[in-house]
Amino acid sequence: MVGGLDIFRERFSQFSDNFVIIGGTACDEILSGTGMRPRATMDIDIVVIVENMTSEFARAFWAFIAEGGYRLGVRKDKDEAPKYVLYSFDHGKVGFPVKVELLSRHNEIFTSAAHTEPLPIDGEVSSLSTIILDEPYYNLTVQNSFVSASLRYAAPLALMALKARAYLNLIADREAGKKINTKDILKHRNDVLKLTATLTGTDRAIVDAEIADTIRAFAEGLLQSLPNQSLQDALRSSEAAIRMFLEALPTYYTARQ
């Protein structure tokens, strides 16, 4: 379990309709009940459900940041107008999550309760935070979420789409000559495949065409890379099993007509 999640749950158990947890913490929640090993993570990434925003949640969040002794994280800024509001806090004190990142579309209720400025993120950052600001991905994540022990998490179908897009973005950036950490690429790749293994025959999502295209491109690219020993080692699976997962992956998403 992610360090500090218990105290986070204590403070926010009544606000499960106000936000969705994404990223590694959501993956950990889903995979912890399976035979697959969750990836270690130290942070909690939160997406605010703007339609359900309340002043009570805003006050509770800022009280938590103060109680945890967090400091404002540093992010790159190109002096461009922010497209959304991002708050990144790290170095939480003992017992709290090491890092908390909150993303929201601009919302006066939330920002007016803050005592610090939001962090604009430029277009070069390939992360779940930037991807989820696209309307189709935001809607998919909110609609495909579940509550477990009083906290709301993104469900596998949403996480897989976010991580497949992040993976493809990072690959494109690397091919364009940008310096990319290979670990970030492998992290998203492996998480998508692990999450695919948790799906059942009834799991389906109606999505915008761009999400269906993303899933198809992700699956086709990895199929072309087989046999892939790195993938087999990471998933502790055979080539045949990985091929089966990749071939099935696009069938879970149907493009909206």
Identify what each model region corresponds to.
Residues 1-257:
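Compositionally biased terminal segments of proteins
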